[in-house]
Structure formats: structure tokens, C-alpha cells
Amino acid sequence: MRLADTSTPAVVLTASPAPLLHGALGVIRSLARLGVPVYLVHDERRAPTDRSKYLRGVVVARYDQAEPAGFLDDLAAVGRRLGRPAVLIPVDDLGALFVADHAAALREWFLFPDLEADTAHALASKRSLYLLCHRLGVPSPETLFPRDRDEALALSERTGLPVVVKAIDPLLLYQREQARSVVVARSRRELLDAYDRLEVLGRPNLLLQEYIPGGADSIWMFNGYLDAGGRCLLGFTGTKLRQCPPHTGPTSLGVCRRNPLVERVTTEFLAAVGYRGIVDLGWRHDARDGRYKLLDVNPRLGGSFRLFVATNGMDVVRALYLDLTGQPVPASTARDGRMWLVEPNDLRASLVYRREGVLTSRQWLRSLRGVEEGAWFAGDDPVPFLAMCGAAVTMAAGKAARTALARVAGRPTSAGCR
């Protein structure tokens, strides 16, 4: 596809410490391939994403939640340097909430959807999202919020085992090098172990959620863009084929599939909360009662957005860019059956599935037939993939060393995919 006007620059923003954030790379490639000048603001030096040939420039800026003024100054400097309003695209929770909280100041230099800060925070918080679903009558898994270990055990009697244990604020776990923010506890011992890993002293950070049986393909994703009037200009659905970490994590292999019911319940929910901008939602189909239950809402771009590409090449980032620069967003039809892969994550996930006896190496290779796009590898932009491989090896070696030291010290460890 082609855009009539690509003169407005785009700034991709990440605020959390995640060096292998493939969503940012997807945005860079999606817009720059059409001729849009794209810049990246993040806090990682020499990250794999920096190596993309499509980037016009990289600004290293560290976000401190305790002192956001410094980050705001850094973004203002970027805006002044560009010399004209740029489309601002946050790709993580911290960045999205920062933009919502400081919208008035940022509008001097940037273009972005007008999403109320209260709405963004309500959707990003697992606690407030559950309460919101309950108030609106939107089906969701039963969720409980224990205040201590004893209450966690007591409440698990109410939900039954297995139970899904989640961190209310996964970002707190980055500081403790705990990658897995979601665990399926199948016994009281596993529940207590998960509690010890996820809880934060003096700040309850754990919830218990009803376990809904089903594989990855029972999770339905919605990826969409809503304009300033709340109209959904683009909205696609799809399912997870594999997750990393397995059974609880983000998509490592997904397929675009139309589901009119998920489309309808999602657009009704988004209208009820007054949503604007790019959104990424997850629903799980509960075969026990036939209902789709809302698992989470990302009030921002989802990392798997390039799974959802229309027959005319449209995706939510391109729809956002067109709309914010005053260009029409064409009607688009999803490419049903399109498959998308996060290469390192799916490889790691396949090893776990293999140990569980549900996926052989040959079956894994066969499952990759038909994949149209990888999150990292691109024939026209191969260097980020090579840099990612090197960074992944370095990170794995460091994690192995920390795990060994933790075992010697008797501390709990965890592993996962980012």
C-alpha cells in the first residue's frame, strides 16, 4: 500500500526496561516501509531494535516514575528537534500511561489519540478492570485479591485448584528480575511459591483468578483502532496457537481468524468505556458456559499487532497514522489465516511443550509452514534479528548464572519469555 502524505514523522516510545521489545520494531518497519520518518525513544543503549535500517534516529531517555518531569523534558527536546508535530506511539504500559497522564503538555509537540487518563489507568490495572467488568456486566473470570499468604490459601478454597496467580503490577517484577507475572498453581505448595515470587512487601501485588480450562486457541485477541469519535476504523480478531511462557504468556505463534461475536462484544465494551486510539484485548472462550470472558486490556499497541494485517496492507499503526494526519482510513478486510511468529519466544515455548509431550520437534517445524511474518527476521532488514540473537544468548547466560547463585542462596527463581 501507499500513503499520500508521509511527511509527518513518527516517534516510537518505550518506557519500561525491556531490551527485546519486538512491538517497537514492528512499528518502525510498518511505517518506514511506506516512507514515514521514524524515530525511537527508549532507555536501552545498543538494543537490537536500534540496528534497524529503517530508523532515522534513536534517543536514549530513562523514565523514572518518581520523577517524570525529566522524561517529559527529554520528549520535549525530541519534539523541538523535529520542528513539527510528530505522531507519538507508546508500545508499553508505562509509556501509554505516561502519555495519558501528561497529554496536555505533550500535545505541544506530538499527535496522539485523546484517551482519558482515568480510562487508561482503569483498563491497565487488573484490579480496576475486574471491577469495571463487574459494573458493566461484562463476563470475566472470578478474581480475588488476597492481602497475605494465609488469605491467599483461604481464597483458593473458594476458586478451587488449579488457580491462576497474577501480579497486579507486573512492572514491579522487572526490578526483581522475575519474568513470569502469571502462574497456574495446581497445588497449595505451588500457590505459596507463586505468592512468594509475586508479592511485594508492603504493597499487595497478587491476585487469584478462576482457572478456565482450554488451550491457547481458546484465547481470542482483538486488535483495533478507534478514532476521536469512538468509531472503530479497524478491528481484527485472531487466536493464539502457542504462548511464551506456555499456557500463560503472550502470543509466540498466532493466526488471524474472524470472530464476529468477539468483534461485537469488544466494540460494545469499548463504546461503554469511551475508548479512543489503538487497543489490544484478550478474551478466553469458556466451554463450560459458552461465554467469552475478558482477560485483559492493553490501552496501547499490542506486541502482536503485525499478526493483524488487512488484504490492502492496513494495520492499526498505519490506521492511527492516517487518522492523526488527517488522511482517510480505507475500509479493510482481514487476511483470514495469516500467521505471525515471535521467533525466539516460540523456540523457547516449543522446548517446554516438547517436555510436556504435546509437541515434537517435527510437529513444531511443520506448524511454522505458512508463517507470513516474523517479529524479528526480515529479509530487507536482517540486522535487528542477528543482534537479537546475540542479545538473547547474553541474557540467557546471565539468567543462568543468576539462577545458579539464587539456588545456592536458597532464593526462589523463575524463568519466562519477554
PLM region spans:
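Flexible, glycine/charged-enriched surface loops at secondary-structure junctions
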Residues: L207, R276-D280, P330-R335
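Gly/Ser/Thr-rich active-site loops/lids in small-molecule metabolic enzymes
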Residues: R188, G303-L322
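Phosphate-binding site of ATP-dependent enzymes
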Residues: R186-P246, R257-T267, R284-K293
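Peripheral (often C-terminal) accessory segments that flank ATP-dependent C-N-forming ligase machineries
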Residues: A319-R418
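Active-site nucleotide/adenylate-binding loops and adjacent lid/helix of ATP-dependent enzymes
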Residues: A120-L207, A228-R231, P260, R411
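ATP-binding N-terminal substructure of ATP-dependent carboxylate-amine bond-forming enzymes
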Residues: M1-L115, D150-L153, M388, A392-T413
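Glycine-rich phosphate/pyrophosphate-binding beta-alpha loops
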Residues: L241-L253, N298-N312
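Conserved metal-phosphate-binding beta-hairpin within the catalytic cores
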Residues: A271-R306
